Amino acid sequence: MTTQEFNIALTHEAISEALADREAIVWRDRRLTYGDLTDRSRRLATYLHRAGFGVRRERADLAPHESGQDHVALYLYNGNEYLEGMLGAFKARCVSVNVNYRYVADELRYLLQNSESKAIIYHSKFAPLLAEIRDDLPEITLWLQVADDSGEPLLPGAVDYEEALASVPADLPDVGHSPDDLYMIYTGGTTGMPKGVLWRQHDIFMSAMGGRTPGVWDPVTSYDEVVDRAVNGMGGVMLMIPPLMHGAAQWSAFILMHQGAKLLIPDENRRMDPASVLRALEREKASTMTVTGNAVMRPLLDEMKTEKYDLSSLTIIGNGSAIMTEELKAEVLDFLPNTLINDSVGASETGAQGSHLSVKGATSTGRFGTGPGLVVLDVFMEKLHEPGHEEPGWMAQSGWVPLGYLNDPEKSARTFPVIDGQRYAVPGDRARLLESGEMELLGRDSVSINTGGEKVFVEEVEKAVASHPAVRDVTVAGRPHERWGNEVVAVVEFVEGASATEAELAAHVGKALAPYKVPKGWVMVDRIQRSPSGKADYRWAKKLAAEAAEAAGGAG
């Protein structure tokens, strides 16, 4: 590993000094240069610093699961303010906290309390919900409200975000920025309560924010090299579709900035609107676009096929966090034959781990080339699997990995075990290490289904169901069964104007999977519920499956 360690605030400062006039963010009528972003993030940092926020205890005085910095919650839709919020927090030696803007009051209260947030930056649209729970959040003493088109007035005691920035100089606070400063990302809470994953900034920079050369994996060795890569790199324009409140989107955005490229945000930032996405792509000639599986790519492709848009600039579609089936990839690449699809694998607890490229005529899903430190541990977490080992194990990552979960030493010890002197991150994904050295990702153990003593990975079933031409989207969950313990249930959304019977769907899946993996229950819905980033909502699917059984007189 490199001996030079990095701080994200300082990497941004160094790049911005060299690229002050280059555009960094484009959203609606806003066109911010790297210099503009530096000015605004410095002002936010100064405002936070003058308000008394920053570092309380240095890393050397803390346990791995502890934070010694003040936390700033970002309760925002995509926009320039989100990245300003992250950078401003880092430059004040605070820690940004990602807040899911779909949360209801109880979920929002839990996250803001659990994260120990001391300040919050939020869009005006969210002011009424915050007002409901504000009395339960006495630790939050600074409320910065970002104006939007909702017409909601300032909360009592809140400060308008733009007025706050205008009230202070654009100075970088002299606070002793350190590679030990924290980056924190809250997990989605898809299968349990959200948890704050703590990373050293140097480690997340190396793991997932552009500190290494993709494919080659060589780490940068100096700030001068970081600047040189940004000045002389590929540049380009990346269209950001997933919400920046999710880790993968944040990592993509920071990789982009560390390449000196431009981040493009669709005009419609509250939902995925295919027309808004493609209008932005055409207008700014975006070269890269990020998506999250079939749920995002299918409606985009349908809109592309109206042939209203010039898509000739698009060369790479980056996919992560959800499955894009081989069938849909082939359809996309038939329509866009000069485009590549890059699947990435990783988790909040591991950073970026591997990738796979699909091109016209050669598509696959679920297998990835492995990066340094990516291994498979046996089921007892005692030894490593060799390539070609038939049994699945735990996908694990060594090297640059997180410190732990905020204020949870027990969970931290389970997820980040030390084996033969090496520390690993083991977030719960099952995988096989193939003879070729590729990784075959099977799925998240926490949402697997045990039916009749056999383990079924829902992602494998979802992939098979989604390959049916009538299926637009699918989520698979388990529900109690008197005989088998649990049975596999598929919640299905059809393509508009298409349909299939349960028997037809089961027969289709049975061609690809063993009988015990074929769904025994089917629930047809108008729309699959997903997170804003496109991730499956397994709690919703499980509840729906159980309700369907009750309505039918009980499962089994």
Regions found by a protein language model. Name each.
Residues 167-186, 192-193, 198, 228-238:
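Conserved pre-ATP/AMP-binding loop-to-beta segment of ANL
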Residues 33-35, 182-218:
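Conserved AMP-binding A3 loop
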Residues 30, 47-103, 240, 315-439, 444-448, 455, 461-462:
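Conserved AMP-binding/adenylate-forming
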Residues 91-166, 176:
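Structural core segment of the AMP-binding/adenylate-forming
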Residues 77, 122-132, 150, 242, ...:
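Adenylate-forming
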Residues 206-288, 303:
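Conserved AMP-binding/adenylation subdomain of ANL enzymes
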Residues 74, 120-122, 282, 289, ...:
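AMP-binding/adenylate-forming catalytic core of the ANL superfamily
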